[in-house]
Amino acid sequence: MKQVNGEKLLASLGDGVKDIRGRITPDAPMDRVTWFRAGGLAELMFQPHDVDDLIAFLKILPEEVPLTVIGVGSNILVRDGGIPGVVLRLSAKGFGFVELAGENRILAGAICPDKHVAAMAMDNGIGGFHFYYGIPGAIGGAARMNAGANGVETRERLVEVNAVDRKGNKHVLSNAEMGYSYRHSAASADLIFTSVLFEGYPEDRAQIRAEMDAVRNHRETVQPVREKTGGSTFKNPPGHSAWKLIDEAGCRGLVIGGAQMSSLHCNFMINMGQATGYDLEYLGEQVRREVFEKDGIKLEWEIKRLGVFMPGREVRPFQGVTSE
């Protein structure tokens, strides 16, 4: 796919951008905003000031221009050819809030870190959110993918999601309308989540603190929390743990280029220093191949791969045919 110059794309939006209050950056380096610290350029990055600013921008953005929404960059792998069109990165100022919204209820902006919701709940004696303390990333992504840990999932706490569609129309989706399943929601990919309403239950703050401490201590013991990583690489197949399948296939510590499957937790892929998007994705596909050849199970990516490949540096997805 041919990538248009960012300045040219910006100019094509016309005078309407003069009323936009957020930050617009042509040719924005994605390796500065993703936790993997790898990948090419975003043709145009937009960080809206608030919901109204987001709507104003969407109304001037032509439908044919691709739009990619990212959160804090914790669960994405950007390919080296970059991301054509507009990358929407919600700003912490307009979308990073967290506040009480009634008895045992919390309202959080889509870019609010998961752990901030856990902390707000603990401070106010609201139970049921300790699991967020161990999940990297932001609330919008957690709501989108039904993030979970320690036996609890987002769908168990979520009341509704506020969103905006590609045309700038507002929507409110109930828990039922989200259509949740394991690490998945049925919400339209066209919807941009702006905030999420949660509900917990009364619980002693000391008990919540103990639960959060247990989550933190476990995570720091078994996960490479200080490495350049995007979190869990693959979903757990039904009845199996992805890390165990990876380990049994001999892929713990496997290295390709500057990328490695962590020796500490082998379902975490890490950038050892200078890994490219190609290195990381090739490593992931090689792991999928090795696991399939060992156990006949096709691992499904949990990390989202975004953008286009550099010419001559394409990664073929493993299709589950060992003769490939």
Curated annotation (Swiss-Prot):
Domain FAD-binding PCMH-type span(s) in chain numbering: 36-203
The keyword Transcription is assigned to this record: no
Reactions it catalyzes: UDP-N-acetyl-alpha-D-muramate + NADP(+) = UDP-N-acetyl-3-O-(1-carboxyvinyl)-alpha-D-glucosamine + NADPH + H(+)
Required co-factors: FAD
Pathway where it operates: Cell wall biogenesis; peptidoglycan biosynthesis
Chief place where the protein resides: cytoplasm
Organism superkingdom: Bacteria
PROSITE patterns noted in UniProt: FAD_PCMH
InterPro entries referenced in this protein's UniProt entry, alphabetically: FAD-bd_PCMH (IPR016166), FAD-bd_PCMH-like_sf (IPR036318), FAD-bd_PCMH_sub1 (IPR016167), FAD-bd_PCMH_sub2 (IPR016169), MurB (IPR003170), MurB_C (IPR011601), MurB_C_sf (IPR036635), Oxid_FAD_bind_N (IPR006094)
Subcellular compartments: Cytoplasm
One Pfam family here: MurB_C
Cellular-component GO terms for this entry: cytosol
Active-site feature positions: 183, 232 (proton donor), 302
GO molecular function, one term: FAD binding
Keywords: Cell cycle, Cell division, Cell shape, Cell wall biogenesis/degradation, Cytoplasm, FAD, Flavoprotein, NADP, Oxidoreductase, Peptidoglycan synthesis
GO annotation terms (biological process): cell division; cell wall organization; peptidoglycan biosynthetic process; regulation of cell shape
NCBIfam families: murB, PRK13905.1
Family (UniProt): Belongs to the MurB family.
Protein name per UniProt: UDP-N-acetylenolpyruvoylglucosamine reductase
Species this protein is from: Rhizobium etli (strain CIAT 652)
